[in-house]
Amino acid sequence: MEELTVVGRSEGYLEEKKSEFFSFLVPSKSLAEFEGFISELRQKNREMCHFCSAVRLRNPTLVEKASDDGEPSGTAGRPILNVLQRKNLINCGIVVMRKFGGTLLGTGGLTRAYSEAAQSCILSAKMGRMVPFSLMNGTIGYREWAKIEKLVREYDKSPQTSFGENIQVSFLVREDKINTVLMLLKEALGGEEPFSPVERRMIFESI
């Protein structure tokens, strides 16, 4: 199953027997960044009694962490983590903060509530994949650029160009298309190979 991630923050809400569950799905590059977000929530929402969470990070190995934050063991963090795992989401985390409503939910009720609250914040999330691209750089003449501009723009609609005595061109190509693009450019330029990959970039692609 393909690993996915998110951009931007999305929120959800669940009420269960007068207890309110507010959930947040946020992109995170590190545990420190995710824990910083939780600390910020605690400072701004002191009336909440629990801030349960789960996060999955890949850089490059997979790291998973879940916290019940005072709820009975296994009733909060694990269900939240299960939601992330089912969607195969990485480099993001979910925090569910609870405002107690006066009625105990029991272990089964808590597990269900935290799971549903976690799912609710995913509903509006912008999900996608991080795709590897290569930045291609090269310097060519004006006549040569006229021969390949259309081809370059098929792969990058907004190539970067700097005009002088010659033209410096930079454009992005998906890594799985590099060999094809280089071959097409070589053919169009009569055997010349002015471009080469200089940098790898991971770019978000919506699904």
Would you name each region that the model predicts?
Residues 126-142, 169:
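Short glycine-/aliphatic-rich beta-strand segments at the starts of folded cytosolic domains
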Residues 171, 178-180:
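Terminal, non-globular segments
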Residues 139-157, 184:
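Short amphipathic alpha-helix segments
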Residues 44-48, 155-160, 186-194:
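A common structural junction motif
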Residues 1-74, 194-206:
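C-terminal regulatory domains involved in ligand/effector binding and gene-expression control
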Residues 14-19, 129-130, 161-163:
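Short, flexible turn/loop "capping" segments at secondary-structure junctions
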Residues 76-124:
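Active-site beta-strand/loop microenvironment that shapes enzyme catalytic pockets
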Residues 117-122, 129, 189-207:
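Terminal alpha-helical anchor/extension segments at protein ends
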